[in-house]
């Protein structure tokens, strides 16, 4: 398939050199580069794992973390969050 793409003169010159070195056409070199780029993007797109903490590092009992009012009350009382467990 034919298409027109605008690329920098520097990249085009490098691609032509690579094509000569490998004995390939310019189109084959560009296609290989795009395939590698797309493959790398797919591999790197894996979702990161989220650590799960057990044993004392989570929210304290008696404090509703979804309520701004509850958090403000705890902070306004001057009590440390650890004292509410």
UniProtKB/Swiss-Prot annotation:
Keyword Transport annotated: no
Keyword terms of this UniProt record: Toxin-antitoxin system
Record-linked InterPro entries: CopG
Induction note: Induced in persister cells in response to D-cycloserine.
GO biological process, one term: positive regulation of growth
Pfam families named among the record's database cross-references: RHH_1 (PF01402)
Function text: Antitoxin component of a type II toxin-antitoxin (TA) system. Upon expression in M.smegmatis neutralizes the effect of cognate toxin VapC31.
Protein name stated in the entry: Antitoxin VapB31
Species, as recorded: Mycobacterium tuberculosis (strain ATCC 25618 / H37Rv)
Gene from which this protein is expressed: vapB31
